[in-house]
Amino acid sequence: MVDGKINVLYEDNHIIVVEKIRNVLVQADNTKDLDMLMLVKHYIKLKYNKPGNVYLGLVHRLDRPVGGIIVFAKTSKAASRLSKSISEHNWQKIYLAVLCGTLKGKGILEDYLKKNEKTNKTIVDKDGKYSKLEYEVLGCKANKTLV
């Protein structure tokens, strides 16, 4: 259960960086479930006692099940600059995952992946899009591996 509280990691006049809550959408969809965009807008509205609508630009996303760090733009100018920076590949994305079982060292996984729209899951399919994943084991404990 999410209580609607957000963890603000950084904030200035242009951006706000928050911890994305696992299993919470980044932006609203047809489920009407809680979403980070709404939570952060609410936070800004309360903190700064803002009347009316709060502008908040969404410049990147994380999948619903994933927790992590997400950056929102507080101005349209910041949104434009951040979007340009992302499209020019000036951002480096680093993902950490905890796996069941143990792996050792480093590796590369390559396959063809295709999204099943009905189940909203990705499967290996020879007609899918080529995908490559490089991983490095950072640690193991209790039959779990951090990569």
Predicted regions and their residues:
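RNA pseudouridine synthases
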Residues: 1-147
